[in-house]
């Protein structure tokens, strides 16, 4: 498990990014001024773009000046540039990584006591859902319910993340909401719990909102390709400070399988 303490530089970067996420979980956001904050990756595995209200955070080990140039070259609304298809395509080509989806990001405060839903923890690390989760998270724990699965683990910058999966035969019975609610009871240490949903997966979005998860923004993760994807966590070892790219904000406008799962 990554503690963010391998090098002083990596730890400092991770702490700043983690603090930004903690603030967002409490409803405190960076200035909505159209600017972009560029940070080094918190570890070799995690890279991507986090878009908040009129502010974006790009976490990559690529040259911040290159990021600035490519954002300025995007022919779109400047506020949309960090998550635009042209810019993400440039990031993928530059890093050799893959963006699977632009996810809707939500967060919820922890709840006291055990969950009401009956759950059985899966200890088998070779379980397919455990293997998948380990490609994106540390400290992974997985529980099974009748017709569904709940995953908890530490994801980007050490934040606790939940993911759920509901069998087709168990849909429309409130199980997704119950699993998402259970995550709020099971998250350790009184920390907020985050969840990513594909925007087109309306069932997942509704389930997490019904469980008390609040919208925060959108996120595109740059995932390593092939067997290197579940890379071990370590400090990125980069000690340069964050860069901010100011983009002009536009003037406000007047007046398959038969199941669903969260991302990843």
Task: Please provide the spans of the model-predicted regions.
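Actinobacteria-biased recognition of intrinsically disordered, low-complexity terminal regions
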Residues: 1-22, 226-264
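N-terminal charged segments
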Residues: 1-100, 120-137
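Conserved GNAT acetyl-CoA-binding A-motif
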Residues: 56-57, 187-199
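Conserved catalytic-core motifs of GNAT/GCN5-like acyltransferases
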Residues: 99-108, 214-231
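Conserved beta-hairpin
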Residues: 135-150
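A conserved beta-strand-loop-helix scaffold within acyl/acetyltransferase catalytic domains
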Residues: 148-159, 164-167
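Conserved acetyl-CoA-binding loop-helix of GNAT-fold acetyltransferases
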Residues: 162, 172-186, 206-210
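Conserved active-site alpha-helix within GNAT-family acetyltransferase domains
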Residues: 177, 199-217, 260, 264
């Amino acid at each position: 498990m990554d503690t963010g303490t391998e090098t002083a530089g990596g730890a400092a970067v991770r702490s700043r990014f983690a603090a930004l996420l903690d603030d967002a979980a409490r409803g405190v956001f960076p200035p909505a001024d159209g600017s972009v904050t560029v940070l080094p990756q918190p570890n070799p595995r995690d890279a991507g773009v986090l878009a908040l209200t009129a502010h974006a955070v790009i976490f990559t080990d690529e040259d911040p000046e290159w990021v600035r140039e490519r954002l300025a070259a995007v022919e779109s609304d400047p506020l949309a540039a960090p998550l635009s298809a042209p810019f993400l395509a440039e990031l993928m080509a530059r890093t050799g990584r893959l963006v699977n989806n632009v996810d809707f990001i939500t967060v919820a405060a922890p709840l006291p006591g055990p969950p009401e839903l009956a759950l059985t923890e899966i200890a088998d690390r070779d379980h397919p859902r455990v293997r998948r989760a380990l490609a994106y998270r540390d400290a992974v724990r997985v529980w099974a319910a009748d017709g569904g699965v709940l995953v908890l683990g530490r994801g980007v910058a050490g934040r606790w993340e939940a993911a759920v999966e509901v069998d087709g035969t168990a849909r429309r019975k409130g199980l997704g909401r119950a699993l998402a609610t259970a995550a709020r009871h099971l998250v350790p240490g009184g920390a907020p719990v985050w969840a990513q949903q594909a925007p087109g997966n309306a069932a997942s979005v509704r389930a997490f909102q019904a469980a008390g998860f609040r919208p925060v923004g959108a996120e595109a993760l740059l995932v390593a390709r092939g067997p290197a994807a579940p890379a071990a966590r370590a400090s990125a070892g980069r000690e340069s400070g964050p860069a901010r790219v100011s983009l002009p904000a536009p003037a406000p406008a007047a007046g398959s399988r038969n199941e669903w799962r969260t991302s990843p």
